[in-house]
């Protein structure tokens, strides 16, 4: 059977830029008559008004999606602390009275649940950024230590994992759709 039509996928930029594009490229080659559109967004509610067909979302581990959506976990995200080697030479996070600082996540800073059991909770926050791309760039500029997904930061040659910090799985990647889309036929 030959499939045709359009599919709209929404996802966060971190997934789109670092994980999704190879899959979209293969899909487009296998199904040339299906036009795939990728919309960058972090809102789960995009599915509510039939704006998109599929949402790929990063959700805290063990958190379930809203009841009006169906889906499954398609991956796990390991996170770890990163900095430049130069920053770590100048600011050892493990010495008492360390001058090392964290690059915080958005408005929450260290109040974010992600920092609850952090080995670096004792450090102050130098700045806050609500986007992984900004945090990556800030860390590359030696502005501090940042907590990033390993699939992003491990590829960055100017960053290293902070010694004594092990990657942790804190988030799942969910593929979600509206429950009434379960039986949608492809033309």
At which residue positions do the language-model features occur?
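Short loop or secondary-structure boundary microenvironments that flank
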Residues: 13, 152, 179-180
